[in-house]
Design a protein with these regions (language model features):
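Long, C-terminal-biased catalytic regions of enzyme "large/alpha" subunits
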Residues: 1-123
Length: 123
């Protein structure tokens, strides 16, 4: 049985692995190696297929967001801006703030330390 995707409109179409890979590649342009993009898209396709014969486009988008968030914050923001339909800078600011909080919690403050280190040459 092949995987199908239920779109927001209610239409159902076959899952397109190439479309998934292309979306990830666009978001990760110059950020992730093509082998990594291929591996991520294959991993997500397999995980989505394990959910059953049908997934929603929202499930696909959220899966991509979650994986990119783990891999590369810039690729995540690029994908998020399109997927969530950012309309202004405030949308980006909110997303960056949330991402920084999450990264700081995950790193136990690692990303915050970078901003508090002294700037300039060390003696």
């Amino acid at each position: 049985m092949s995987l199908v995707v239920r779109k927001r409109s209610g239409d159902v179409e076959p899952f397109d692995h190439a479309k998934l890979a292309a979306g990830i590649a666009r978001a990760a342009s110059a950020r992730l190696e093509s082998d990594t993009v291929d591996a991520v898209s294959a991993e997500l396709a397999e995980a989505l297929g394990m959910r059953g014969a049908e997934v929603t486009s929202e499930e696909v988008g959220v899966a991509v967001l979650e994986r990119l968030r783990e891999l590369d914050p810039i690729a995540y923001l690029r994908f998020s801006s399109v997927y969530k339909g950012f309309e202004d800078l405030a949308d980006f600011e909110r997303e960056v703030d949330e991402l920084q909080r999450d990264l700081a919690q995950r790193d136990l403050g690692g990303s915050l330390q970078k901003t508090t280190e002294p700037k300039g040459p060390r003696n």
